[in-house]
Amino acid sequence: MAYVLTVASNVNMREPSESKESESETSDDAASDDDDEEEEAQPASNAYATLLQSFSTRHAGSDEHRKKRRKLGHEEAPQEDVSDAEGASVYGTPEGDGTVVDPEQNETDDEAADEDDGKEQELEKAYEKHFASPDENELATRLKRIATNQWSSQKLTCGSGTTKGFGVLQIPGEEVQPPPRKVKSVHDIQLKQRLVDNALKKVGNFDQVEQTIAPSIFGYQDLLFGARTVQNAARLRDITCLHALNHILMTRDRVLKNNAKLAAAPDDVDAEYRDQGFTRPKILFLLETKQACVRILDSITKLHDFEQQENKKRFLDSFSQPEDKFSEDRPADFRELFEGNDENEFRIGVKLTRKTLKLYSTFYNSDIIFASTLGLRRAIESGDPKKKDYDFLSSIEMVIMEQADAALMQNWEHAEYVFEHINLQPKDAHGCDFSRVRSWYLDGHAPNIRQTIVLSAFITPKINTLYNKHMRNVAGRLKYTADHTDGLIESLSYGIKQTFVRFDSPSHLTDPDARFKYFSSSVLPSITRLPRTAEAGGLGVLVFIPSYLDFVRVRNSLVDSDFSYASISEYTDATDVRKARSHFMNGKHSLLLYTGRAHHFHRYNIRGVKRVVFYGVPENPKFYDEVLGFVGKSIERAEISRQEASVRVCFSKWEKMELERIVGSKRVGRLVRDRGDVFDFV
């Protein structure tokens, strides 16, 4: 069940300078168009002429037959590439789907494909069933069930101890069919032969959790994985990159084989092979930082051997920085996210040819797009507002969102905006050969064929909404969460009394008002009654506020009060932060208002904290632990006794998901439903 909170979207943080963005987005495709023509034969660019030709009788000679299937629009001059930051398109000249490869490549790849045929039959079946030739009756039935939200479910349990987790597999069919066999290693997923050796070396065997999610990943089902950690991040990255590469090679080989069949077909036979989309890009990686983009590229290049990587130095100069700017005392998840280049506005196209990986290709000439949600939204909205260009997303067949929990700390509206613009019918032809476009693209079913993989450290109501709205795959979907039976609270050893207080909140729509009323009428008066300690005059009360809008509301309410307070938000400049921390530590200010996003972006180590009030339950349970640690260190420094220290958590019944991660699933029901509204833990 999805719990929906009406929390206003946050404002984006960490935007790069315009000059850097311009440098990172300028495409090199225009300069290398001639080289591309030598390596790849593009499909026809006159879409409507080709469509008409496909219905006519083939009575011309072999030259005429080939003309129907080759690019016709060479007379059209390429557009000049200009950076998005300057308000113009970064896409360059549209060149169609682009998965057709030149005759020079046909001979080599066809021989390899023939050798692989016997070994890849099972994989071909999965690809054939989902993408190439789905059964029309079965597809119609499943689409109808999805439209009426009819899913058959099966619960999955795997792992033990810290790796234990639970999954819910849903299929829009009569019943959930178990996978035909266990997927224990890369041997069991029947990769394209050219990926096997590297996959065995770099990925190898799957652990228990990976064995649970691998059938969904390689079976083209949607996956919401809510148990991403620093420890399993690299493995998840390698597995998803392996799947993405495998899909690109599957698509390319299918087109090559069909090209050969078309070339060999008699002139009096009107053969038709629907094996493409409207545009070329097939894979979209939604990433949080430029450094995350570097890690994805590293994974791709270690799984597939490319003879050349064009523009690699330029890419590293713009996207990569040394990953040693934070000391070891910072939390591991913070260092993983923000080490290196933490800019979060970027987008870059990647083109894969027979021997080469080309960075900075134009979107319409790319196989893969790496982007942040902010960067992609600005690419769509650049230029004339009435002529937004999102056609390059029309044929995306796989979306991989790597750190959804971090995206929540940016502006989640960007993620919603991007998903709303994926797989829409294109406004222009872009050189598409409609006779090669798959039927389900033409029928508008691409959103239900697309595979979406979302990786997150935890699941929130907003992520659940994304799952319910945009992850509606005809092959099914799997939601996997970590085990929260005991919750974080059982692992804490501070010995501090923690009081959870539930306030009445009739509706999630009015929850912010009910929360503020409770805080103003109950929490603030109780703070005024707190005794001052003899050694340090300040009360040392830190008020942790997850939402910035709530923070502004509380801060404004204190302006005319008798409280001496300081505040730190994500927008507070460094000088004011130092002043606020200093005055709070020495007791000049009794209250410190501290936002969740300020903690996310900086992980300040705040001294002088003797008591904590959580205005709301943090979505990230690590924040709860770290803020309690402020009090623990005050106790160690003998600034307050363990008996005097306290923690108070204000919550409503709409925060069940956040509570579960802290108090545990075995207790959360009692907290949100019991008649009593005060619950103490030590």
From Swiss-Prot:
Which GO MF term does the entry hold, naming one? U3 snoRNA binding
What does the UniProt entry say about where the protein is found?
Nucleus, Nucleolus
GO BP annotations listed: maturation of SSU-rRNA from tricistronic rRNA transcript (SSU-rRNA, 5.8S rRNA, LSU-rRNA)
Q: Which InterPro entries match?
A: P-loop_NTPase, UTP25, UTP25_C, UTP25_NTPase-like
Record's keyword terms, sorted: Nucleus, Ribonucleoprotein, Ribosome biogenesis, rRNA processing
Q: Can the keyword Nucleus be found in this entry's annotation? A: yes
The Basic and acidic residues compositionally biased stretches are 120-133
Region span, Disordered: 1-136
Q: Name one GO cellular component term.
A: nucleolus
Q: Polar residues compositional bias: what residue ranges?
A: 43-59
**Acidic residues bias spans:** 24-41, 104-119
Q: Name one Pfam family in it.
A: UTP25_NTPase-like
Give the family from UniProt.
Belongs to the UTP25 family.
Q: What does this protein do?
A: DEAD-box RNA helicase-like protein required for pre-18S rRNA processing, specifically at sites A0, A1, and A2.
| Subunit structure comment from the entry | Component of the ribosomal small subunit (SSU) processome composed of at least 40 protein subunits and snoRNA U3.
Please give the name of this protein.
Answer: U3 small nucleolar RNA-associated protein 25
What is the native source organism of this protein? Pyrenophora teres f. teres (strain 0-1)
